[in-house]
């Protein structure tokens, strides 16, 4: 079984419409859509926005349905200038941009007694990269950073880039999903399409391009499912 997680209705709608033998299950205010996509058994999860929602949803997904792997799909704000709206980021690893326990000797972004970053599964990264190339999308591999703030100001963006110069994109759930998968030893990957440039116009461009980003990220998931 393949677990798929998206934070917003807009980010999972295309995938939900592809599910056959659909069964809707609600646990602790989290919606799960169980069924099949192209004969592959899936559970599509509407996590809600933010790190706590993402961690709760991922934990429920793992404990209730025991997925073999987890795919996180959705949108993100670009931090790297090589990414434009509609482009795709495949996570090699994920960390928090708003965690700071440096006073106790930890790295910025590191939760105490946890890794500095959470590495995506190598095989899933290779598969996602292959799909992006086959679909002739502009895709990049790299670090994605997460925090409980929508990055809609240039000053916020610059602070994150100063602290995490290798970060390619920013959003609000991926690292919580990654940490939960790490703790439960479930392979994962994060694929996000760019909906905005994490700048002063981010809120407007997000609203305008979330549909395009959802389409791109959903296409990657659908193609990956054919090989899982």
Curated annotation (Swiss-Prot):
Pathway: Amino-acid biosynthesis; L-methionine biosynthesis via salvage pathway; S-methyl-5-thio-alpha-D-ribose 1-phosphate from S-methyl-5'-thioadenosine (hydrolase route): step 1/2. Substrate binds at residues 77, 151, 172-173. CDD domains: MTAN (cd09008). InterPro entries: MTA_SAH_Nsdase, Nucleoside_phosphorylase_d, Nucleoside_phosphorylase_sf. SUPFAM superfamilies: Purine and uridine phosphorylases (SSF53167). Keywords: Amino-acid biosynthesis, Hydrolase, Methionine biosynthesis. GO terms for biological process: L-methionine salvage from methylthioadenosine; L-methionine salvage from S-adenosylmethionine; nucleoside catabolic process. Its EC number is 3.2.2.9. The active site is at 11 (proton acceptor), 196 (proton donor). Coiled coil: none annotated. GO terms for cellular component: cytosol. It catalyses: S-adenosyl-L-homocysteine + H2O = S-(5-deoxy-D-ribos-5-yl)-L-homocysteine + adenine; S-methyl-5'-thioadenosine + H2O = 5-(methylsulfanyl)-D-ribose + adenine; 5'-deoxyadenosine + H2O = 5-deoxy-D-ribose + adenine. It holds the Pfam family PNP_UDP_1. It is an enzyme of class 3 (hydrolase). One of its GO terms (molecular function) is methylthioadenosine nucleosidase activity. NCBIfam families: MTA_SAH-Nsdase (TIGR01704), PRK05584.1 (NF004079). Catalyzes the irreversible cleavage of the glycosidic bond in both 5'-methylthioadenosine (MTA) and S-adenosylhomocysteine (SAH/AdoHcy) to adenine and the corresponding thioribose, 5'-methylthioribose and S-ribosylhomocysteine, respectively. Also cleaves 5'-deoxyadenosine, a toxic by-product of radical S-adenosylmethionine (SAM) enzymes, into 5-deoxyribose and adenine. Belongs to the PNP/UDP phosphorylase family. MtnN subfamily. This is 5'-methylthioadenosine/S-adenosylhomocysteine nucleosidase. It comes from Staphylococcus carnosus (strain TM300). The gene is mtnN.
């Amino acid at each position: 079984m393949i677990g798929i997680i998206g934070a917003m209705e807009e980010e999972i709608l295309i995938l939900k419409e592809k599910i056959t033998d659909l069964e809707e299950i609600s646990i602790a205010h989290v919606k799960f859509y169980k069924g099949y996509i192209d004969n592959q058994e899936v559970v599509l999860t509407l996590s809600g926005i933010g790190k706590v929602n993402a961690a709760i949803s991922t934990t429920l997904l793992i404990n209730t349905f025991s997925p073999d792997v987890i795919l996180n799909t959705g949108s993100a704000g670009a931090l790297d200038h090589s990414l434009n709206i509609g482009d795709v980021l495949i996570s090699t690893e994920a960390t928090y941009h708003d965690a700071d326990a440096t006073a106790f000797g930890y790295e910025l972004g590191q939760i105490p007694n946890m890794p500095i970053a959470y590495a995506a599964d190598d095989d899933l990264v290779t598969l996602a990269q292959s799909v992006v190339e086959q679909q002739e999308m502009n895709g990049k591999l790299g670090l994605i950073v997460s925090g409980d703030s929508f990055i809609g100001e240039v000053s916020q963006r610059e602070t994150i880039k100063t602290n995490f110069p290798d970060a390619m994109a920013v959003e609000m759930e991926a690292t919580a999903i990654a940490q939960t998968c790490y703790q439960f030893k479930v392979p994962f990957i994060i694929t996000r399409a760019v909906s905005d440039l994490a700048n002063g116009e981010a809120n407007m461009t997000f609203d305008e391009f979330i549909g395009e980003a959802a389409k791109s990220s959903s296409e990657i998931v659908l193609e990956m499912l054919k090989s899982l």
